[in-house]
Amino acid sequence: MKIKFDQNMDPRGATILKQAGHEVLTVKEQNLIGAEDEVIAKVCQDESRCLVTLDLDFANTILYPPQNYFGLVVLRHPKPTAKSLLELVRQFSAALQSLDPTQKLWIVEPGRIRVRE
């Protein structure tokens, strides 16, 4: 799967996904740090990439209707630490083996993934 890692994501998470066979680009690698959410969303559409982020704005289905994207994935943890967020990336990676986030919003939380279409 083609994935875009937002600027608020630990780059070690991108490595986890790359090792699982996914094609991952980061916002930093594309010199998009500081870009507005709308710009990031448009780049993801243009590149057919699923966005992985901590930014709750992307969970707003009115602003970002999931059917218009190749996947919007928001990681949520009640006590976010680098370690706990990397665990959520691993959980997301495992889910990709059997599920497809295309045209969906996934909220990845410890032990579950909420899906909105």
Predicted regions and their residues:
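Short secondary-structure capping/turn micro-motifs that flank functional sites
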Residues: I33-G34, L54, A59-T61
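Charged phosphate-binding loop/patch that engages nucleotide di/tri-phosphates or the phosphate backbone
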Residues: A94-E117
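Short secondary-structure boundary segments
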Residues: Q7, L54-L56, H77
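Mid-chain, well-packed structural core segment of small domains
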Residues: A59-F92
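N-terminal first-folded block
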Residues: K2-C50
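Structural signal for conserved beta-strand scaffold positions within catalytic alpha/beta enzyme cores
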Residues: T26, T53, V74-R76, I107, ...
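Absolute protein N-terminus
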Residues: M1-K2, E117
